[in-house]
């Protein structure tokens, strides 16, 4: 068998997120949560669960937490989640991939400047949900060729894809 891959494993953003949760486990004796699974890897999520990390998936669950640490998943989350964490004075570890965080900043700036934001991806994927949550106003999500028609009504507007 010939092995062609020069490397294998997680990309740096995912590895950074996973490392941040394990580091938090070592340094923190309190309750630790992740907002959504830290990554799309059942073995990692299961191992973290066995070590006491609880995955929360909704704003309602987040609002019920009175103390502890919440780790933001590698895919990022909407700005609303950061606001709730701040309001509740919960410790936060932001494990959002730096590339994803850069997209959050771009859509925030561009939508604040009046541009219509168009996101290419699956509307229900956590990364897309997070990106949409940084848009001021509404974002258009294009999943496939059929969705391209959504753009037609914005032909004369300033857009950011």
Give the location of each predicted region.
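The feature marks the mature, well-folded catalytic cores of soluble enzymes
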Residues: 1-160
